Amino acid sequence: MGCISSKSTQTGKKEGKTAAERKAAWEGIRHGLPRRKTAEDKARRIELFKKFDKNNTGKLSME
């Protein structure tokens, strides 16, 4: 069992976004996720979890 990768990753050549673009993208993700210890963020985390918990088991599954 191994990891299948393209030739571009094997040669070490980076294609696509620059480091600054990737950093900006992650900043956007961080700002969009409810990470603070506030009541509002906690409520948002609960709502997000409910969207992912399709089986209503209190667990995340691969289905």
From Swiss-Prot:
Region described as Disordered: 1-23
A Gene Ontology molecular function term of the record: calcium ion binding
An annotated GO cellular component: motile cilium
Biased composition regions of type Polar residues, renumbered to the chain: 1-11
InterPro entries for the chain: EF_hand_dom, FCABP_EF-hand
Annotated compartments: Cell projection, Cilium, Flagellum
EF-hand domain ranges (all copies): 40-63
Pfam families: FCaBP_EF-hand
Binding site for Ca(2+): 53, 55, 57, 59
Compositional bias (Basic and acidic residues): 12-23
Top-level taxon of origin: Eukaryota
Family: Belongs to the calflagin family.
The protein, known as: Putative flagellar calcium-binding protein
UniProt organism field: Crithidia fasciculata
Gene responsible for this protein: CABP
